[in-house]
Amino acid sequence: MSEPARLISPEKRGEDLDITLRPQSLDEFTGQAEARANLKVFIEAAKNRGEALDHVLFVGPPGLGKTTLAQIMAKELGVNFRSTSGPVIAKAGDLAALLTNLEERDVLFIDEIHRLNPAVEEILYPAMEDFQLDLIIGEGPAARSVKIDLSKFTLVAATTRLGLLTTPLRDRFGIPVRLSFYTVEELELIVRRGARLMNLPITEEGAREIARRARGTPRIAGRLLRRVRDFAEVARAEAVTREIADEALTRLLVDNVGFDQLDKRYLNMIAVNFGGGPVGIETIAAGLSEPRDAIEDIIEPYMIQQGFIQRTPRGRVLTAIAWKHLGMQPPKDMEAAQFRLFQEDN
């Protein structure tokens, strides 16, 4: 059964849109130091030349700050910010309406650009390259091509699946930026900043406990902080301590590494039903009754980054870390079998 309301899902929810908790500048933004440093240079150079910033593509798992960075870029460039997403732009007319309303150097943000309609994508190419729209007006013998000049704008796009972008689209982004999961130390700073903006007293240990369970994702850290605040207020606690954070998150079924029941079902299924793997993604999706995309985009990235599973051409394989987390003993021949598997695959 699908679980759209998972507390630790990195996907956006209404409560995550609290603009008061969002950083308003690159200096306020915590984490992604290399990306921020490069963006500062590109923004400053574009401002000095009085030109539109080159098109930017953010790549990375959900919840790492792609939308926030796009908004900050527009603010630091001193231009307007327009936002949409790939699935919303259903036809060429929708894209034309967006592009023709942009002013000089404005930022247009397209989230989930990998889900853009292929027919719309074709229209986007000349818009990005030549700042022109090539539209076909009418049908049949009466059809004619019309060129519309556009203001020089900056397209900032975000994707969780770089491999799903066509090569022509990918090549038109002059500034590719890959975002990675945050460290516990970075998330602790984010939690403490959020608590300060909420006027919520929190101890260093309390902030770290929330950060440890946030799966390397600021959006999840903010959501966990809100739920822990609820427990602290009802308990009339003077501050969020490690004990309060631990009790709240344990009651919410978020374990000490940030896994919930769905994550545990995933690991348990591979361990119990398939002896630790390898097992194919389609089999896992069927066993969990979850879409393949949700598993690849939401469940697996953090597990892979933390070393709980490995992706191989033959399927997913549990690591020793995963077996230890489950409190199970791996099959005696696991190491030898996995060694043979990796040797054959290489």
From Swiss-Prot:
It comes from the Bacteria. GO terms for cellular component: cytoplasm; Holliday junction resolvase complex. CDD domains: AAA (cd00009). Residues 256-346 are annotated as: Head domain (RuvB-H). It is found in: Cytoplasm. It catalyses: ATP + H2O = ADP + phosphate + H(+). DNA binds at residues 292, 311, 316. Mg(2+) binds at residue 67. It is an enzyme of class 3 (hydrolase). One of its GO terms (biological process) is DNA recombination. ATP binds at residues 21-22, 63, 66-68, 129-131, 172, 182, 219. InterPro entries: AAA+_ATPase, AAA_lid_4, CbxX/CfxQ, DNA_helicase_Holl-junc_RuvB, P-loop_NTPase, RuvB-like_N, RuvB_C, WH-like_DNA-bd_sf. GO terms for molecular function: ATP binding; ATP hydrolysis activity; four-way junction DNA binding; four-way junction helicase activity. Gene3D superfamilies: 1.10.8.60, P-loop containing nucleotide triphosphate hydrolases (3.40.50.300), Winged helix-like DNA-binding domain superfamily/Winged helix DNA-binding domain (1.10.10.10). Residues 1-182 are annotated as: Large ATPase domain (RuvB-L). Keywords: ATP-binding, Cytoplasm, DNA damage, DNA recombination, DNA repair, DNA-binding, Hydrolase, Nucleotide-binding. Residues 183-253 are annotated as: Small ATPAse domain (RuvB-S). Its main location: cytoplasm. Its EC number is 3.6.4.-. Has 3 domains, the large (RuvB-L) and small ATPase (RuvB-S) domains and the C-terminal head (RuvB-H) domain. The head domain binds DNA, while the ATPase domains jointly bind ATP, ADP or are empty depending on the state of the subunit in the translocation cycle. During a single DNA translocation step the structure of each domain remains the same, but their relative positions change. Belongs to the RuvB family. The RuvA-RuvB-RuvC complex processes Holliday junction (HJ) DNA during genetic recombination and DNA repair, while the RuvA-RuvB complex plays an important role in the rescue of blocked DNA replication forks via replication fork reversal (RFR). RuvA specifically binds to HJ cruciform DNA, conferring on it an open structure. The RuvB hexamer acts as an ATP-dependent pump, pulling dsDNA into and through the RuvAB complex. RuvB forms 2 homohexamers on either side of HJ DNA bound by 1 or 2 RuvA tetramers; 4 subunits per hexamer contact DNA at a time. Homohexamer. Forms an RuvA(8)-RuvB(12)-Holliday junction (HJ) complex. HJ DNA is sandwiched between 2 RuvA tetramers; dsDNA enters through RuvA and exits via RuvB. An RuvB hexamer assembles on each DNA strand where it exits the tetramer. Each RuvB hexamer is contacted by two RuvA subunits (via domain III) on 2 adjacent RuvB subunits; this complex drives branch migration. In the full resolvosome a probable DNA-RuvA(4)-RuvB(12)-RuvC(2) complex forms which resolves the HJ. This is Holliday junction branch migration complex subunit RuvB. The gene is ruvB.
